[in-house]
Structure formats: C-alpha cells, structure tokens
UniProtKB/Swiss-Prot annotation:
Substrate binds at K31, R45, Y57, Y141. Belongs to the PPase family. This is Inorganic pyrophosphatase. PANTHER family: INORGANIC PYROPHOSPHATASE (PTHR10286). GO terms for cellular component: cytoplasm. It holds the Pfam family Pyrophosphatase. Transmembrane segments: none annotated. Catalyzes the hydrolysis of inorganic pyrophosphate (PPi) forming two phosphate ions. Homohexamer. It comes from Thermoplasma acidophilum (strain ATCC 25905 / DSM 1728 / JCM 9062 / NBRC 15155 / AMRC-C165). Gene3D superfamilies: Inorganic pyrophosphatase. It is an enzyme of class 3 (hydrolase). It catalyses: diphosphate + H2O = 2 phosphate + H(+).
C-alpha cells in the first residue's frame, strides 16, 4: 500500500484548490510527519518549547519543495482536526521562511467549509494579530532545540500559487507524473 503522500492527488483544481493532509492539529505540541514510504503517520517529536501550533499544519500531497519535503501548508479553520485528516483548501498567501539556512516557505490556506473563515479571500482579510502569532510561533518554536528559523514576511496569493506550481513540478521531476 502506498503512502498518502503519493496516493492522494494534489487537489481538484491546483494550484487554486488543493488537498492538505493534516500532520499537526492546531493546539498540539506533538510533531507528526506523514510517512513517505508507507501509509501512516510518524511521531517525529514533542516540541521542546512550551508553545503549540497556532493553526492546523500539513502538506500538499505530490509536491516537493527546496528543503526536500512536501510543500507545507497552514490551514485557517476554527476547530482543530486530527493527524491524517484530508481537506480541500484554498491558498490565500505565503509566509516566507528560512529553517537552518534552507528555504522553507509555508502556504497559508482557508478551509472553505468553515463559516468562521470562509469569508477570507486574501491575506489582507486575515486578522493582523493572527498573522503575527503565526510568524512568532515559527520564529521561536525551535529555539530550545538550538536550531535557527527566520520568518522573512508574508506574500500574497499569487506568490503562493506560483510556489505550489513549482513544488508540483519538482515532485513530478523526481517521481514522475501521476494520474
């Protein structure tokens, strides 16, 4: 049986609508990662700092990014889901980030079937304080691991869509195109 990473499609209408496989629900300190070679989730670690993920966090299947991992996605949803949940989301922006010297940008997306966030159409519609919370989390969550991360700011929807297209192309170059 194949990993969800390879078996779940990118989405119904990429890059405007993509699937996300949730790895870490909002409010968790446990870092899960989807296994790439078999179906399942691996527990990577418990965060060293007393912080929790401020959003549901996961990946777009059948993507590959500069850091060698799938494209990361932060999902705006009013209730936490669970590791392994798959949802269709709409990208609205991107947080530019460097993790230990490697580009590790993260897509910000909205779960449209949640009336608490479905009105969000663009990065400018997101509460500025929430964007600050997200950036602060990713700036500090690895400090006690003695690892350096740096948030470089936010970019809009067009930049996010282009980055998703790049990550799809990188996946196809490595693994081949799948139906």
């Amino acid at each position: 049986m194949e990993s969800f990473y390879h078996s779940v499609p990118v989405g119904p209408k990429p890059p405007e609508e993509v699937y996300v496989i949730v790895e870490i629900p909002r409010g968790s300190r446990v870092k899960y990662e989807i296994a790439k070679d078999f179906p399942g989730m691996l527990v990577d670690r418990v965060l060293y700092s007393s912080v929790v993920y401020p959003v549901d966090y996961g990946l777009i299947p059948r993507t590959l990014y500069y850091d060698g991992d799938p494209m990361d996605v932060m999902v705006l949803i009013s209730q936490p889901t669970f590791p392994g949940a798959i949802m269709k989301v709409r990208p609205i922006g991107m947080m530019k980030m460097v993790d230990q010297g490697e580009t590790d940008n993260k897509i910000l997306a909205v779960f449209d079937k949640d009336p608490n966030v479905s009105y969000i159409k663009d990065l400018k519609d997101v509460n500025a304080h929430l964007l600050d919370e997200i950036a602060n989390f990713f700036s500090t969550y690895k400090i006690l691991e003695k690892k350096e991360t740096k948030v470089l700011g936010w970019e809009g929807k067009e930049a996010a869509l282009k980055e998703i297209e790049v990550s799809i192309k990188m996946y196809e170059e490595k693994y081949g195109k799948k139906n």
